[in-house]
Regions:
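A short acidic, Gly/Pro-enriched loop at the edge of an enzyme's catalytic core
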Residues: 94-101
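Conserved class I S-adenosyl-L-methionine
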Residues: 1-42
Length: 234
């Protein structure tokens, strides 16, 4: 069972305040012409709007319950014919089609615990791409201020939904816990610095084209958030 299974039904309310990335990834999908593979597709928060823009999406996720929600969302919004969902691992996705764009939104690569796992996921993305295809994803590396403000405190993220961040700065690991009245789960996020991502992407067969500091495409200036656009090398 995935650690996201218990919160599949509250995931969208929990992440309701995160909206800026949706338009960004829809624009990337439209520019690619599709189809698009989304790694860690979750509840379809990104995939369904991409499908509503007329682009076919092939999604993979380790949480069957999140995929169930994604199917419901696609059906309710009339785009189930454009959303193909698979249960599987980001490091070995059960997808055989080659596409012009692979995306991995909402910092999902940080679920990979070590550099070896992250590199395996990057190589899996590389294998899914057409020649000169692009891989677009976002991650973060926390600021000292963010760690100090949130460490070890339960905060109400949305009405009735609480989250707690426990930071292990030397180990560069965030243990994030989410709870509501009847569900609770915890999972780890493992961050890297910008230079470390550059090295991993190079080893994974990618050329970094752009790194932005947010989804409005502001230049990256050693900030917390990193949004990468990378081209597949042959």
């Amino acid at each position: 069972m995935s650690y996201y299974d218990p919160i599949a039904r509250i995931y969208d309310p929990w992440s309701r305040s995160v909206t800026e990335d949706v338009e960004f990834y829809v624009e990337a999908a439209l520019a690619s012409g599709g189809p698009v593979v989304e790694l860690a597709v979750g509840t379809g928060r990104i995939a369904v709007p991409i499908a509503e823009a007329g682009i076919r999406v092939i999604g993979v996720d380790l949480s069957q319950r999140m995929l169930d929600v994604a199917r419901e969302q696609a059906r309710e919004r009339g785009v189930e014919h454009l959303v193909e969902l698979h249960h599987g691992d980001l490091c070995d996705p059960p997808i055989h089609e080659r596409v012009p764009l692979v995306i991995c939104p909402f910092r999902s690569l940080l679920h990979m615990a070590g550099t070896g796992e992250k590199l395996a996921a990057l190589r899996a993305a590389h294998a899914l791409l057409e020649p000169d295809g692009r891989f677009v994803f976002d991650v973060f590396a926390p600021s000292r201020e963010d760690i100090e403000e949130t460490d070890g405190r339960w905060l109400e993220r949305e009405p009735g939904i609480f989250e707690r961040a426990d930071w292990d700065e030397p180990g560069r690991t965030l243990t994030l816990s989410v709870r509501s009245d009847d569900v609770v789960t915890s999972f780890g996020l493992h961050w890297l610095s910008r230079p470390e991502w550059d090295d991993l992407l190079d080893a994974g067969g990618f050329e970094v084209e752009e790194v932005w500091g947010w989804f409005d495409r502001r230049p990256f200036a050693d900030e917390e958030d990193m949004v990468f656009s990378c081209r597949r090398r042959a």
